[in-house]
Design a protein with these regions (language model features):
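Alpha-helical transmembrane bundles and membrane-interface segments of multipass inner-membrane proteins
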Residues: 1-159
Length: 159
């Protein structure tokens, strides 16, 4: 699994770029589409930008439970930071996918604290199938988890 060494510049770059990309993209889209449910076709009939406010978790599960998801986000971020601190202290390599996961968690946590909801805006449709609206932070979390899972599944057996 790719990892940052003692000075985790690549890890920090992924973390910073991911968090900034998420927050800036949300800010731009929500400035262009200021009202909830506003939408703009990007590539008909597949891809749209949409102002959607999510007070729940993934796919809107637990809608209205922003406080619970705010606490869960803080716990997840603290767990990752503690893990990274222990790994760095022991001189272990830092898994780069955690940088993306952490960046996404920070982006969505910022939204929950600042607005009381997560700003989702990427909407994908294929025929009658409509994927739940998401954002850059969600993508970073999913990609980070997928890369970590792949790394764990493909890692050689310890001797």
């Amino acid at each position: 699994m790719p990892a940052a060494r003692r000075f985790p510049w690549l890890f920090l770059a992924i973390l910073a770029f991911g968090a900034v990309a998420d927050l800036v993209s949300k800010s731009i889209v929500f400035r262009v589409l200021p009202h909830e449910w506003d939408s703009q076709t990007v590539w008909a009939p597949f891809f749209y930008l949409k102002n959607q406010r999510n007070t729940g978790g993934v796919w809107g599960i637990g809608n209205g439970a922003n406080g619970i998801f705010l606490i869960l986000s803080i716990v997840a971020i603290l767990a990752i930071v503690i893990y990274l601190s222990v790994a760095a202290f022991r001189g272990q390599r830092l898994p780069l996918p955690l940088a993306g996961i952490l960046a996404g968690a920070f982006g969505n946590l910022w939204d929950r604290i600042q607005f009381g909801f997560v700003r989702d805006f990427l909407s994908v449709r294929i025929g009658s199938f409509h994927w739940p609206t998401f954002n850059v932070a969600d993508s970073l979390i999913c990609i980070g988890c997928a890369v970590m899972a792949l790394g764990l599944l493909c890692a050689p057996e310890p001797e």
